[in-house]
Each structure stands twice: as C-alpha cells, then as structure tokens.
Amino acid sequence: LTFFLKFVIVMKMQLIDTHCHLYLDAFAGDIKSVMERASDEGVEQLLLPAIDSTELDNLLNLEKEWPKNCFAMMGLHPCSVKESYQEELALVKDWLTRRPFIAIGEIGLGYYWDKTFILEQQEAFNLQIDWALQYEKPIVIHSRNSVADCISIVKQHQHGKLHGIFHCFSDDISSAEKIMDLGFYMGIGGVLTYKNSGL
C-alpha cells in the first residue's frame, strides 16, 4: 500500500487587543508575564489608548519596550477634561506633529462619573475628531452614558472619511444600528453582561 501524507497547514489566528491600558501602575510589576500570556493566547498586537499627560511617559515607554506588540494612540480621555483641558489638548496636538500614532484615542464623552465639564468634553471631542481627519487616523470613542451625543457629534463630521470604534459599547440595538450606519465598529466587553445593558 502506498500512503499519501497530507500536510494540513493550520494558520494560527492573530488576535489584536484594540483597547488596553497596560501602562497603568496596576501592571507595572508583571508586565512581562502579561505580555507572555497575551502571546500564548494568540494576542500579538495591543493598542494602547492615551488618557492624559500624567500617564503619557508610561504609555510611550511601554510602546518602546515592546515595539513589535504595543502601539500607542494619542488623545485626551473625556474623564480627564478638567480645568486645564486646553493645555492637555495643546500637548496632544504637539505630539501629533512629532510622530505617527496608530489612532486618536481615547476620546469622546463620559457622563457616568461627572457632568461638570460636558461642554468642554464636547469641545475636546470635536477638536480631536478634526485632528483625526487631518492626520487620516481612526478614532477610539469613549461613550459611557453618552452614546446618543457621541453619535450626533460623529455624524456631523462624517463625510465618508471618518472611521473608528465605539469602545466598550453597551447601549441598545437602535444605537448599534446608527453606529454601523456611520461606518463605525463597536467594542464589546464585559459591560454588555450587566443587567442594565440595552442589548
């Protein structure tokens, strides 16, 4: 008998974590093991959203330490929009002129913790969307308790060139359809399992 050996090439799926803040102090002691576990599970690339100037050095240092795996975003998180938000935005703009980033983020609106700076958050969101269009970068949107307003603002800027993801989406089907109509993706996380999730 002649045996024919068949070689089946199995390609391992490459996974990308589109949103992880691995540069925060909580990971400082075991970042190497975190990266090894991610690789063991097929997660080869990790996208790092910016928060504000207080974490910027840690963000960029992690990217420098793991240049084949970690890719930095640049932006001002809506929960960091406070009294000094204009200086923070100036820093974001300055960094965008210095080097390329994978995306503009984490930007958007956050009404869950504090509603003191809603108008300033909206101003910062609009401005950073303009920069995303200028630099032809996707945006990563924080929309906790603010999905309708985020959709409205994105819609005003959407002329076919704006794209990105609504991070940690937990709203209802109607909002999901509007987001898809805008050509955007949704990040689905554990929040979707909460009782008050709209899906």
Whereabouts are the PLM-identified features?
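Mid-domain alpha/beta scaffold segments of enzyme catalytic cores
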Residues: 3-199
